[in-house]
């Protein structure tokens, strides 16, 4: 009787050893083992506790596949907020602040309120930009994980 793969139960003719298991659990196809590790995310055999000889390889960045479903709705919201506040900041900074401050008499409170009014969009833009950078970093980490594949070798 020919040995059978313990994953797919098909006949198996080539002996490859990925762990220290004996008997029927030693026999497994290459493709079945790759799919098993990809599905289970296990790095060692559950029966004999031997670690598999796995090397994780990340695809080159030019071959990465990005998915919008990995991007959270809040990240899209922050990107939109950033663009809106950036545009508002550009429009408001085009107005000559010094002209407004100089035209007011020596009223310090008016100058202070005017400066706060014009600096607020800039501050909001900076905060939303930092938040956007954080979300982009998280998205890149998720994309890097999704664009990594494992290669398993015999012992």
Swiss-Prot record:
This is E3 ubiquitin-protein ligase LAP. Gene3D superfamilies: Zinc/RING finger domain, C3HC4 (zinc finger). It catalyses: S-ubiquitinyl-[E2 ubiquitin-conjugating enzyme]-L-cysteine + [acceptor protein]-L-lysine = [E2 ubiquitin-conjugating enzyme]-L-cysteine + N(6)-ubiquitinyl-[acceptor protein]-L-lysine. A zinc finger (RING-CH-type) spans 1-55. It comes from the Viruses. The gene is LAP. One of its GO terms (cellular component) is host cell endosome. Zn(2+) 2 binds at residues 19, 21, 45, 48. Belongs to the poxviridae LAP protein family. Pfam families: RINGv. Its EC number is 2.3.2.27.
């Amino acid at each position: 009787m020919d040995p059978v793969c313990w994953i797919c139960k098909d006949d198996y003719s080539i002996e490859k050893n990925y762990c220290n298991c004996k008997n029927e659990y030693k026999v497994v196809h290459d493709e079945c083992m790759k799919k098993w590790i990809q599905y289970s995310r296990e790095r060692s055999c559950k029966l004999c506790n031997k670690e598999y000889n796995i090397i994780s390889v990340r695809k080159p960045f030019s071959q990465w596949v990005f998915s919008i479903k990995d991007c959270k709705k809040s990240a899209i919201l922050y990107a939109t907020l950033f663009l809106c506040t950036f545009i508002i900041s550009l429009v408001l900074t085009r107005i000559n602040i010094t002209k407004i401050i100089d035209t007011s008499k020596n009223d310090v409170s008016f100058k202070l309120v005017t400066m706060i009014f014009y600096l607020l969009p800039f501050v909001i833009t900076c905060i939303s930009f930092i938040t956007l950078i954080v979300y982009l970093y998280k998205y890149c980490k998720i994309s890097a994980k999704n664009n990594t594949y494992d290669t398993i070798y015999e012992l």
